[in-house]
Amino acid sequence: MKLGLSSFFIILFFLCGPAYAKEFYKEFNIKVSGIKIGKLIWTIKIDDTYYLNSLKLKSEGFMSAIYRFSGEYYSEGFVKNNKLNPTKYSHVWKTKKIKKNMELTFKNNRLHSLNQTPYEKEKLRVDVFNIKKAKDPITSFLQIILGENSSLVVDGRRVYTMKATFNKKNNKTVVDISNYSNLWADHKRSKFEKITFEKKSGSPLPLKINIYFDGRVFGLEQI
């Protein structure tokens, strides 16, 4: 059963009261081709005015001896008319060879600033600061999980649209990625394709998520 965002806040209000935030915490194994490569911790704090969304992942399993990684993804913002509106987003990605940082701020339903390291010397190919109603990727995904059908995304490297289709028979939602544009040159030609997720009836967050990226499938299974 799909839980709409308005229904979610009604339940949240009656269970917790307007003065208390509800916190959700889940752990997932990360797998590729059935092999565990890491672990993800997902924390959400949300009430009727504010939300915080945090994902932390780290390499685990025997593959970590070959390829070590860690990442942190964070967004926060305000809730208005049952819509999530980001004010800040950041992510950090580390391996043995690289460390990448991205920081975005949002104001008046638009991207306000973009800072990243390593610094990008190329000029922006898209006038991303004048795109209305753009949101960071983890705010967009959370909004879809809670019942919205679509969201316009800017992640600092790309702009794209998430559009969800729910299948009642298998209780699975497919989030297609469309209108895909790179803000800078992508020399690896990598592409974000789609996301699928499954939820248990009455649960606001998924039990299983599959991320289709650059011809590979990254599976997240709740521990």
Feature locations, PLM:
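Sec/Tat signal peptide C-region and signal peptidase I cleavage site
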Residues: G17-A21
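A contiguous pocket-lining binding segment that forms or flanks enzyme active sites
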Residues: I131-N149
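Serine/proline-rich low-complexity intrinsically disordered segments, especially terminal tails, linkers
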Residues: F8-F9, N115, L142
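Hydrophobic, well-structured mid-protein blocks that either form specific transmembrane helices
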Residues: K96-D136
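Acidic, serine/threonine-rich low-complexity disordered tracts
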Residues: K22-F106, Q143-I223
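Positively charged n-region of N-terminal signal peptides that target proteins for export
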Residues: M1-S7
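Bacterial N-terminal signal peptides
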Residues: S7-L15
